[in-house]
């Protein structure tokens, strides 16, 4: 059962800035395994490129047989064949196999998981780093989304001016993601200010390597701290549980739905809040992730909303709440 794959360039509607970079386009890899759809959106930050993804897909292509009965076993076999730093490659294969498996059962993935899609929390819509005027314009354009996630982390002074202006413009639920861009003293000052602005939580305030800083910040923070870059897979959670209030799970960094489900179980055992997030992705990966929505507290599944040329259609939003099609598999079809 060969893996068919193709590279697709996602064009962003607007330049998308985070603390580390600004992008106008993103290359992803779409795969098809016997009618099962998957997607890889690789990140150099986690050790992958388009070339490593396509090379690794070719290496395992002939190892996937069409007659598998036990999906967890099959995904485990494929994981063992891939290099360690191949999370988005594994994620693409993982979601394609779930798509095949649930199509054979003629049920959507959420029914296989055993959850009610109506119980998904509302998703945030992300405002990337830009000039204050442009960020305020983006807030206006996002009128239909009740929860906004604001990207910060390049300059703490400018960050707080932007947040003050955004809060003056809207009373929506606001979340902040610094992508590890602040130093400890900056983070303390910023979080104090953000608490006054009634921000819900702050995501990854410090660099993932600043463990001592994160431990100190956890003790004094006036807002809940959600960790993203520190938490890649389930085994990372026990190491970080003592200095965060919650975690951000992404299929592209953990390796797919199977590992995401393990992460949810481990995080709950440690009493942590859970968010399902995303990279810039098409509706293939976003919709696959949305099936996990009823299991978590927060969603940030807007990657497909930031692109102008999504080649697939699947989950949509109504007042910020995911609406997952009642279709077999991961509930995605090519856009007409």
Please name every model-derived segment.
Residues 31-33, 93, 106, 177, ...:
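Conserved, mostly hydrophobic/aromatic
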Residues 38, 148-150, 202, 247, ...:
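Hydrophobic residues within beta-strands of alpha/beta enzymes
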Residues 7, 34-104:
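Metal- or metallocofactor-binding catalytic centers and their adjacent structured scaffolds
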Residues 209-301:
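Catalytic alpha/beta core domains of metabolic enzymes, predominantly
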Residues 101-102, 167, 218, 267:
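A generic structural signal for well-ordered alpha-helical segments
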Residues 111-221:
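Metal-dependent enolase-superfamily TIM-barrel catalytic cores that perform enediolate-based chemistry
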Residues 1-12, 23-28, 279-336:
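Flexible C-terminal active-site loop/helix
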Residues 15-21:
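Short, P/G- and charge-enriched loop/turn segments at secondary-structure junctions
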């Amino acid at each position: 059962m060969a893996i068919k794959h193709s590279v697709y360039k996602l064009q962003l509607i607007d330049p998308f800035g985070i603390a580390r970079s600004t992008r106008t386009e993103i290359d992803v890899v779409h795969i098809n395994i016997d009618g099962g759809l998957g997607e890889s959106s690789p990140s150099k930050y986690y050790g992958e490129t388009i070339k490593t993804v396509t090379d690794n897909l070719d290496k395992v292509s002939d190892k996937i047989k069409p007659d598998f009965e036990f999906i967890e076993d099959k995904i485990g076999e494929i994981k063992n064949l891939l290099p360690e730093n191949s999370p988005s490659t594994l994620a693409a294969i993982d979601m394609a196999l779930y798509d095949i498996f649930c199509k054979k059962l003629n049920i959507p993935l959420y029914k296989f998981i055993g959850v009610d899609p109506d119980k998904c929390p509302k998703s945030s819509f992300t405002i990337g780093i830009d000039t204050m005027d442009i960020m305020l314009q983006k807030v206006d354009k996002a009128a239909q989304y009740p929860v906004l996630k604001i990207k910060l982390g390049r300059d703490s002074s400018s960050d707080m001016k932007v947040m003050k202006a955004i809060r003056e413009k809207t009373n929506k639920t606001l979340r902040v993601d610094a992508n590890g861009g602040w130093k400890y003293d900056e983070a303390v000052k910023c979080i104090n200010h953000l608490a006054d602005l009634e921000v819900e939580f702050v995501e990854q305030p410090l660099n993932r390597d600043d463990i001592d800083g994160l431990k100190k910040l956890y003790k004094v923070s006036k807002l809940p701290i959600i960790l993203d870059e520190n938490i890649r897979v389930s085994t990372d959670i026990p190491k970080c549980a003592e200095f965060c209030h919650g975690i951000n799970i992404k299929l592209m960094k953990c390796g797919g739905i199977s590992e995401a489900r393990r992460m949810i179980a481990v995080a709950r055992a440690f009493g942590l809040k859970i968010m399902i997030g995303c990279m810039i992705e098409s509706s293939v990966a976003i919709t696959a992730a949305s099936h996990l929505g009823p299991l978590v507290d927060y969603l940030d599944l807007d990657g497909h909303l930031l692109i102008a040329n999504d080649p697939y259609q699947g989950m949509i939003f109504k007042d910020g709440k995911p609406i997952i099609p009642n279709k077999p598999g991961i509930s995605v079809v090519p856009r007409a």
